[in-house]
């Protein structure tokens, strides 16, 4: 019985087996909505074509993390394609566009039409930067966007279906003991899976406590997350540590 979507469950507990079960239930529902399956793909390209799919090619944390990856791809060996399935472009969209061989805004397209466009562009590897977060296009990958489909960065949980071949992670995000709870094969990056920008600009503005109506002497605790992630178990753990 389906009782919750996969994404919010990630913040409610760290039971990877439950995460897999919920992801599989959600994926099964998505699969049932797809007709005319075809896993036949194009012949090999001269250069490998990598398609990055994201609703966050804009001023968004995923955008800031992935930017240098897109910038530093060896363009002599790879053609890089961008598929933006988010609702609104901004100045960061303009910045990232120049790092793609081709860039498509596919927000108005259906999941199945996005898969068709990817096939028409003969994408060899589809990298999903969204997972089950907002504006996800799960059915694109069930339909088949590329011969190889990878879950990376935006959603560090399993997609729970056989249509994703790999998840890019590290031994902290997915330790070997948890491989059984991932439908994908796990590809490890050394040290840390999370890409980042090498030249992040740090604000030079000095903030004062009074700007935020904070007392001058008290210790200030901060949690820079959505408040739904602060549940009784998490809060009790903080109190125990303190």
What are these regions (language model features)?
Residues 1-214, 226, 236:
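Alpha-helical solenoid repeat scaffolds of the TPR/TPR-like class and their adjacent stem/linker regions
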Residues 222-233:
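Substrate-binding clefts and catalytic carboxylate motifs of secreted carbohydrate-active enzymes
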Residues 240-242:
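Short, intrinsically disordered, charge-balanced linker/junction segments flanking boundaries
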């Amino acid at each position: 019985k389906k009782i919750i979507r996969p994404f919010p469950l990630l913040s409610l507990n760290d039971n990877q087996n439950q995460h897999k079960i919920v992801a599989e239930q959600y994926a099964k529902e998505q699969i049932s909505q797809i007709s005319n399956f075809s896993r036949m793909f194009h012949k090999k390209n001269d250069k490998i074509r990598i398609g990055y799919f994201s609703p966050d090619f804009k001023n968004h944390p995923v955008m800031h993390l992935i930017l240098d990856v897109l910038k530093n791809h060896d363009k002599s060996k790879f053609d890089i394609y961008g598929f933006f399935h988010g609702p609104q472009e901004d100045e960061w969209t303009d910045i990232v566009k120049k790092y793609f061989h081709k860039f498509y805004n596919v927000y108005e397209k259906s999941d199945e039409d996005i898969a068709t466009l990817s096939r028409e562009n003969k994408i060899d590897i589809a990298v999903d930067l969204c997972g089950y977060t907002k504006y996800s296009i799960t059915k694109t990958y069930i339909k088949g966007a590329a011969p190889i489909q990878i879950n990376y960065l935006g959603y560090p949980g399993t997609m729970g279906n056989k249509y994703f071949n790999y998840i890019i992670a590290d031994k902290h995000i997915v330790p070997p003991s948890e491989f059984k709870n991932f439908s994908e094969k796990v590809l490890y990056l050394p040290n840390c899976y999370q890409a980042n920008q090498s030249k992040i600009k740090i604000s030079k503005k000095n903030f004062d406590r009074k700007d935020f109506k904070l007392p001058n002497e008290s210790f200030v605790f901060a949690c820079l997350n959505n408040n739904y992630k602060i549940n009784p178990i998490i809060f009790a753990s903080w109190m125990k540590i303190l």
